[in-house]
């Protein structure tokens, strides 16, 4: 009966965190709108080989992540949940792997379930795992690779070892098809310390070629298909999206070596109090083969991405699966022997919740700021934000009431965040970051437009997805569409600021022309260097400018 109660609690936890509240959150630009529109266009066109965004070739990522996202929209429709269904599914599958692997290592069902709950409630996992980007997919394939390699190396027969390495190659191949060659580098770097300490080089060299073969065979069908359709895809993807993005001086998202330290700290909430002890206990017990393996999969990817010039918080998502397993193991030991770390964890959550309550007041309409984050008419959003932090502090306090038994309720600290964050986003943020909000406010003006132009790729993708049309034209800025716009068949999909007046004269009689621009909050739109418009509708950071036929 206790196992049944645990399972019911787990399903309720998943429903409250990963299912019920997802539709209440609008899509964020540029990431979610981009991936939503790529998958919508894939479904609309039936082209499952070459990714397109706004009808243009889009070679920043391979295809597998778009396949999963497209299946999500196909199953659940073109809505917020459908867009995020793929990443939620991948995150839950990763948690299932965490459960299975923990059970295999320690033969403890409670520990296995706890590891999954810790993983799913980690702030970084929840934030990225309910956000429509490709990182939850690559995290799943990397964790699957972690499990496959362990299976292969622990097998006692040549058949078992061969099957494990073949499975490892498939997971690496799917990782390559999701986000590129990093899916090869991370597993190699992660297993080397374990192989070295355990002196398992022989098995690696004898069977490792099977992983190489299965990886190549996994990628080969689509790799050949896109090479035939778009011969320059692999050149662009390898040199621009890998070498330039991560290693060269002009790499995207440049950040210092220590960038991931605050990411690890914030991402470990509401289990931050367990982080030092889990890592220290793992190092202290490094003679234990499984502990070394988990430590290696936690630390080595972190070091690899720290050395790379280009950095984003999402890159290290896979590190938190083995870390959650180490945390769960350490937490049970602490509960039995010395619950000091569990008490510290409770106080950290209380402090975080109280700090959030105070910060919410400071940026509210009743606080000291001249330009508050929320306006007076948004008072219900302020109370939602207060509720988020109040619940966080409450469950932090509850874990201290009988810490040896109640410490695991820290998993409920983010419950308010999960349920209420969609209702607490300030309008000033929604107007710039949620194109759906803008479309809802300007639907009647946008719908009959013959041409729509915008100066933001994220906004363009949001407009395209909301209006179910891929013919949005870029104005003044090309952004990440620069490469796709260079093709001859993309002519007419970009209009520069200097050319706009002439372009307008040529196309005005064809129907309503709508210009959607991103502007600064205090920018005077009358100073914009554009022809006089027939209608202007400003929604704070986004402004709709319309020209009608004369």
Swiss-Prot record:
Subcellular locations according to the entry: Cell inner membrane
Group of enzyme by EC: transferase
Keyword Cell membrane annotated: yes
Broad class of the protein's primary localization: membrane
TM region positions: 7-27, 81-101, 113-133, 134-154, 165-185, 204-224, 263-283, 288-308, 315-335, 346-366, 382-402, 406-426
Catalyzed reaction equations: 4-amino-4-deoxy-alpha-L-arabinopyranosyl di-trans,octa-cis-undecaprenyl phosphate + lipid IVA = lipid IIA + di-trans,octa-cis-undecaprenyl phosphate
An individual GO BP term: lipopolysaccharide biosynthetic process
GO molecular function: 4-amino-4-deoxy-L-arabinose transferase activity; mannosyltransferase activity
Record-level GO cellular component terms: plasma membrane
InterPro entries linked to this entry: ArnT_tfrase, Glyco_trans_39/83, LipidA_mod_glycosyltrf_83
Pathway annotation from the record: Lipopolysaccharide metabolism; 4-amino-4-deoxy-beta-L-arabinose-lipid A biosynthesis
Protein EC: 2.4.2.43
Keyword Cytoplasm: no
Keywords: Cell inner membrane, Cell membrane, Glycosyltransferase, Lipid A biosynthesis, Lipid biosynthesis, Lipid metabolism, Lipopolysaccharide biosynthesis, Membrane, Transferase, Transmembrane, Transmembrane helix
Membrane topology: Multi-pass membrane protein
Purpose: Catalyzes the transfer of the L-Ara4N moiety of the glycolipid undecaprenyl phosphate-alpha-L-Ara4N to lipid A. The modified arabinose is attached to lipid A and is required for resistance to polymyxin and cationic antimicrobial peptides.
Family label: Belongs to the glycosyltransferase 83 family.
Protein name: Undecaprenyl phosphate-alpha-4-amino-4-deoxy-L-arabinose arabinosyl transferase
Source species: Escherichia coli (strain SMS-3-5 / SECEC)
Chain's gene name: arnT
């Amino acid at each position: 009966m206790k196992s049944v109660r645990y399972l019911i609690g787990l399903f309720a936890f998943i429903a409250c965190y990963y299912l019920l509240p997802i539709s209440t959150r609008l899509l964020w630009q540029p990431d979610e709108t981009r991936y939503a529109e790529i998958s919508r266009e894939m479904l609309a066109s039936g082209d499952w080989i070459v990714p397109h965004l706004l009808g243009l070739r889009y070679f920043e990522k391979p295809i597998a992540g778009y396949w999963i996202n497209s299946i999500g929209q196909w199953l659940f429709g073109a809505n917020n949940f459908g867009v995020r269904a793929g990443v939620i599914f991948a995150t839950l599958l990763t948690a299932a792997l965490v459960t299975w692997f923990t059970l295999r290592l320690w033969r403890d069902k409670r520990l296995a379930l706890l590891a999954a709950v810790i993983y799913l409630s980690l702030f970084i996992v929840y934030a990225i795992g309910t956000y429509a980007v490709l990182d939850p997919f690559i995290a799943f394939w990397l964790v699957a690779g972690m499990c496959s390699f362990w299976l292969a190396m622990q097998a006692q027969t040549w058949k078992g070892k061969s099957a494990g390495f073949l499975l490892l190659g498939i997971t690496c191949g799917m990782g390559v098809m999701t986000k590129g060659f990093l899916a090869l580098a991370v597993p190699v770097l992660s297993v080397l310390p374990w192989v070295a300490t355990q002196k398992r080089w022989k098995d690696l060299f004898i069977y490792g070629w099977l992983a190489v073969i299965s990886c190549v065979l996994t990628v080969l069908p689509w790799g050949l298909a896109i090479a035939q359709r778009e011969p320059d895809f692999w050149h662009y993807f390898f040199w621009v999206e890998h070498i330039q993005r991560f290693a060269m001086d002009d790499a995207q998202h440049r950040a210092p070596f220590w960038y991931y330290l605050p990411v690890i700290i914030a991402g470990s909430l509401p289990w931050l109090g367990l982080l030092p002890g889990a890592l220290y206990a793992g190092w202290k017990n490094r003679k234990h083969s499984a502990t070394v393996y988990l430590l290696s999969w936690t630390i080595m990817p972190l070091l690899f991405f720290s050395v790379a010039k280009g950095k984003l918080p999402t890159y290290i998502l896979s590190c938190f699966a083995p870390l959650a397993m180490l945390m769960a193991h350490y937490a049970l030991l602490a509960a039995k022997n010395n619950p000091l770390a569990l008490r510290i964890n409770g106080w950290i959550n209380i402090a975080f919740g109280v700090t959030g309550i105070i910060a919410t007041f400071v940026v509210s309409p009743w606080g000291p700021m001249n330009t508050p984050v929320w306006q007076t008419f948004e008072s219900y959003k302020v109370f939602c934000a207060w509720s988020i932090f109040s619940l966080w502090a409450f469950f932090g306090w509850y874990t201290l009431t009988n810490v040896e038994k109640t410490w695991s309720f820290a998993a409920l600290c983010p419950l308010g965040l999960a349920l209420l964050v969609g209702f607490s986003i300030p309008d000033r943020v929604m107007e710039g970051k949620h194109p759906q909000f803008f479309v809802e406010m300007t639907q009647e003006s946008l719908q009959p437009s013959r041409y729509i132009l915008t100066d933001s790729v994220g906004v363009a993708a949001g407009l395209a997805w909301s209006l179910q049309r891929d013919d949005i034209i870029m104005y003044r800025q090309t952004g990440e569409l620069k490469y796709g716009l260079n093709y001859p068949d993309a002519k007419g999909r970009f209009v520069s600021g200097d050319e706009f007046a002439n372009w307008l004269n040529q196309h005005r009689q064809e129907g309503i022309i709508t210009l959607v621009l991103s502007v600064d909050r205090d920018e005077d739109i009358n100073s914009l260097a554009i022809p006089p418009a027939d209608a202007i509708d400003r929604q704070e950071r986004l402004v709709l400018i319309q020209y009608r036929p004369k």
